[in-house]
Amino acid sequence: MKISSLGWVLVLIFISITIVSSAPAPKPPKPKPAPAPTPPKPKPTPAPTPPKPKPKPAPTPPKPKPAPAPTPPKPKPAPAPTPPKPKPKPAPTPPNPKPTPAPTPPKPKPAPAPAPTPAPKPKPAPKPAPGGEVEDETEFSYETKGNKGPAKWGTLDAEWKMCGIGKMQSPIDLRDKNVVVSNKFGLLRSQYLPSNTTIKNRGHDIMLKFKGGNKGIGVTIRGTRYQLQQLHWHSPSEHTINGKRFALEEHLVHESKDKRYAVVAFLYNLGASDPFLFSLEKQLKKITDTHASEEHVGIIDPKKLSFESKHYYRYSGSLTAPPCSENVIWSVSKEIRTVSSKQVKLLRVAVHDASDSNARPLQAVNKRKVYLYKPKVKLMKKYCNISSY
C-alpha cells in the first residue's frame, strides 16, 4: 500500500506529538526544543481554545458605569424652586404696615365732628304744636314695620321715651263690661268763643288751629279750666268701643295753664256727610300734597262742632302721637256720628303720606279705671259740662 506525502506528514506530526506527550514530567526545561515541532502548525489547535472568552466580562462592566452620570443633574432642579419662594414673602410685609398708620389718624379726628348730629333730634320737642303734640309729624310714621313706626317711637328721641315705656298710654279699647258706671261727672258742656283759625297739613294729619288759643273758658275738669287749642282727625279711629273700630275720630285738644291736657273725642261711622267738615272742604283741597303749608280759614265758632253728648267714657291717658305725654284726661263720646266716605278720603288724600292710616295701635289698659258717664234722667240737657271726678 502506498502512502501519500500528506500521509507521511501526518504520521510525522503524530509521532512528534507522541514523543512530546510521552516525555518525562520532572524535566520541564527540555520542552524548549519543542519549538522545532511547532512549525508543523500545532499552534493553530490552541487558537480555538484560547481564552478569548475573557473579553466577555468587558462588555458587562463598562456599560453599567455610565448610569451614575445622570445622577448629578437631579440636585440642580431641586434647589432652583426653593430660593424664589422665600423672596416674595418679605416683599408684601413691609408695605402693609406703612399704609395702616396713614388712614388711622384721620379717622379718629372726624369722629368728634359727627357727635353733634344727635343735636337735631330734640327739634320736635322744643317746638310742640298747640296741644302738646309734635308740630312736624314727618319725624315719625304709622308704618307698623318701618324704622319710624309706632313700635319705634320711644327710641327716636329722648323726649319721646314715654311712647315706649309708659303705662298709661292711649288709645285703648273701651269695653262696657270693664267700665265703672258713674253719674258724678256731670253733663258735657263747652263755653267757646268765635276765634281766628288756620288749617295745616302736619305730615300725618290735618290740624285746625285756633290762634292764641280760644279765649273762652273751654271745658272744666276737676276744677281746672282748659282752653281749646286745636282739633285734628284720625282715620280709622284710634279708640275702639267693645272691639269695634270706626271710620274716623275727631280730637278736640284743650290745654290748661300748667300744661296739662284734656281731649274730647268723637267717633264717626260712614253715612251722611259731617256739616263742619263740609265747611272746610275748600281749604282742605288747597293744602293737598303740601306738607307744612298753612291756609287761613277765618273766624270759626267752635259751637258749630256740636259738642253735646249724653254718654261718654272718661279715663287718664296720654297723647296718641309723640311725645306721648301721660298728662291727658280723655272724654270719648259714646254717641257715634256720621261722615261721608268722600270726606274721609279727602282728609287722607290731603295728607298723602306713605301709610293708609294715621291711627296709633291700641295700648294696654293696665290697672287704670275706665268710667262711663250716664246721667240721671233729670240731668239730661242739650249741652254737657265736663266736671271733676
UniProtKB/Swiss-Prot annotation:
Processing after translation: N-glycosylated.
Organism: Arabidopsis thaliana
Reaction(s) catalysed (UniProt annotation): hydrogencarbonate + H(+) = CO2 + H2O
Keyword Zinc found: yes
Principal location: plastid
Transmembrane segments: none
Function per UniProt: Reversible hydration of carbon dioxide.
Enzyme class: lyase
Glycan-modified residues: N196, N385
Entry EC number(s): 4.2.1.1
Cross-referenced SMART domains: Carb_anhydrase (SM01057)
Span of domain Alpha-carbonic anhydrase: 138-374
Subcellular location, record wording: Plastid, Chloroplast stroma
Name of the featured protein: Alpha carbonic anhydrase 8
Endpoints of the signal sequence: 1-22
Biased composition (Pro residues): 25-129
Binding site for Zn(2+): H232, H234, H251
Catalytic center residues: H204
Disulfide cross-links: C163-C324
SUPFAM superfamilies: Carbonic anhydrase
Transmembrane listed as a keyword: no
Chain intervals for the UniProt region annotation (Disordered): 21-153
Ligand binding (substrate): T320, A321
Gene Ontology cellular component list: chloroplast stroma
GO-annotated molecular function: carbonate dehydratase activity; hydro-lyase activity; zinc ion binding
